[in-house]
Amino acid sequence: MALADDLKKWVGETFTGKWEVQETTSVPNPEDLRLNSNHAKDLKAATVLYADLDGSTDMVNTKKWQFSAQIYKTFLKCASDIIRDEGGNITAYDGDRVMAVFTGNSKNTSAARCALKINSAVLDIIQPAIAKKWQTDFVLRHVVGIDTSQLRTARIGIRGDNDLVWIGRAANYAAKLTNLAGKPTRITADVYNKLADKLKYANGVDMWAPEHWDDMGIWTYTSTWKWTV
């Protein structure tokens, strides 16, 4: 019963303890927060990007494991390097997707350009490499979801095995947007409205199409455009 007693004590203290919240303008590391106490960091404005493979379950069920491993490795490597090149902070890998947080004055523009570059990497780098190596009709599809909001983060887990959890609309909506297949890039209207014009228009043509997200009751924007890496 020692474990049960310890857990009851810890859970009780977590629900009754007072939160210490510190404002920050940058993405913290897990070590910046205390693990076993109600300690959080508050980003007043941050933009979250999720890049996710679409159809990976079918791929694993029908393709050789080596093929699937190469798809995972190349997609996540390209997405991660592009995220970092655009100033994003990688905060988590979850199976076939990567999460990143962008801060600063150009966070929405940087995140959107990142998404278009990931699309370019898929179309112009990964897909040609697939065709060169494998005789297959497989088409790599992905979705990048982006939202912006206030975010809080807290440290979760146990000593020696812990990470950060992100609490806020952007973290949830960006992840959920990747569940909407059909378009490689999806952003909320809050992100679109804060984009620099160079990320909205190409030769006077809007690169984004409005689409209502019925489940959440908000407007989003989709794009099939790419931005050369």
From Swiss-Prot:
Residues that hold a ribonucleoside 5'-triphosphate according to the record: 50, 97
UniProt KW rRNA-binding keyword: no
A GO CC annotation given for this chain: cytoplasm
A molecular function GO annotation: nucleotide binding
Cofactor: record remark: Slightly more active with Mn(2+) than with Mg(2+).
Activity-pH behavior: Optimum pH is 7.0-9.5.
Keyword terms of this UniProt record: Antiviral defense, Cytoplasm, Lyase, Manganese, Metal-binding, Nucleotide-binding
Compartment annotation: Cytoplasm
Effect of residue 52 to A: No cUMP production
UniProt binding sites for Mn(2+) 2: 52, 96
Effect of residue 50 to A: Decreased cUMP production
Primary site of residence: cytoplasm
GO BP terms, alphabetized: cyclic nucleotide biosynthetic process; defense response to virus; intracellular signal transduction
Domain (Guanylate cyclase) ranges: 47-178
Residue numbers binding Mn(2+) 1: 52, 96
EC number: 4.6.1.26
Reaction equation(s) it catalyzes: UTP = 3',5'-cyclic UMP + diphosphate
Required cofactor names: Mn(2+)
Subunit structure comment from the entry: Homodimer.
Function of the protein: Pycsar (pyrimidine cyclase system for antiphage resistance) provides immunity against bacteriophage. The pyrimidine cyclase (PycC) synthesizes cyclic nucleotides in response to infection; these serve as specific second messenger signals. The signals activate the adjacent effector, leading to bacterial cell death and abortive phage infection. A clade B Pycsar system. The pyrimidine cyclase gene of a two-gene Pycsar system, generates cyclic UMP (cUMP) from UTP, has little to no activity on ATP, CTP or GTP. Expression of this and adjacent effector BcPycTIR (AC A0A0J5WTU0) probably confers resistance to bacteriophage. The genes are probably only expressed in response to bacteriophage infection.
Entry's family note: Belongs to the adenylyl cyclase class-4/guanylyl cyclase family. Pyrimidine cyclase subfamily.
Identification of the protein by name: Uridylate cyclase
Gene from which the chain derives: pycC
